[in-house]
Amino acid sequence: MSDREMSEDEGLEEEKAPSLTASATPLALAPADLLRTAADPALTEDFALALLKRADLSVEVIEQLAKNTNALKSRKMKIALASHPKTPRHVSVPLARQFYTFDLMKVALSPTVPADVKVAVDHVLISRLKTVTVGERLMLARRASGRVAAALLLDVETIGTKITDAKTVARETRVTQAALENRRLTEALVINSVLRPAATAALVHAVAQHPKWSCRREIRAALLRTEHLSLARALEFSHEIPTPLLHELLTNSRLPPQIKDQLLRESQASSPPAGC
């Protein structure tokens, strides 16, 4: 066969197999064609984003998209890939480590992202809290997941163990209050936060005075186990707890001994006499 004939044959083959990205729409592609399309170096951002709107993509197709370096030049593409419900953790989490703060928040809040991936993405975000600005901390406290809000309750800006100045106190108070107002924050997360050794007096006082959280019985019981609750609040919260249960609770409490003793005296004095 001559060189000319070979060249003509190759041209015919190319005509028979044009790039799928040029001849089809993402939703029209048959499952058998998806893998070849995902690997196509000519894959455009718009086509790839439209492709990721398909819920029927296989893990193999998603992994192939993750290997398509041309497609992954796009920030939108990376976010869409990490947010797809079929994207495996070993693909989405490394991608998430490349994201900006609010891109991480967006992925973690996406309803399509699997729960275990959301947790992993939240952990990436939490690991960066020391490096974000005050404005970003406030925004995260208001809008991020409950896990991030709970982390912000504990992640106060300090030097050593002492808050540096009045401005820092005011900033961190705003962050704490914003986190406590976060609609995704749960009772369990608040309890876990106040019981952590890292919980500050400011956090305990903020929760103890909060109009929503301070009314919860389980949170009151948790606050009675902390070392920072004021005597006035401790007396108020202990009044609704039966004496035997209060004894048990205070056994594991870090409250100062003098406050524990007064709570027990008040509880015994208000208890009805035996046999009544």
What are these regions (language model features)?
Residues 2-276:
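Alpha-helical scaffold segments
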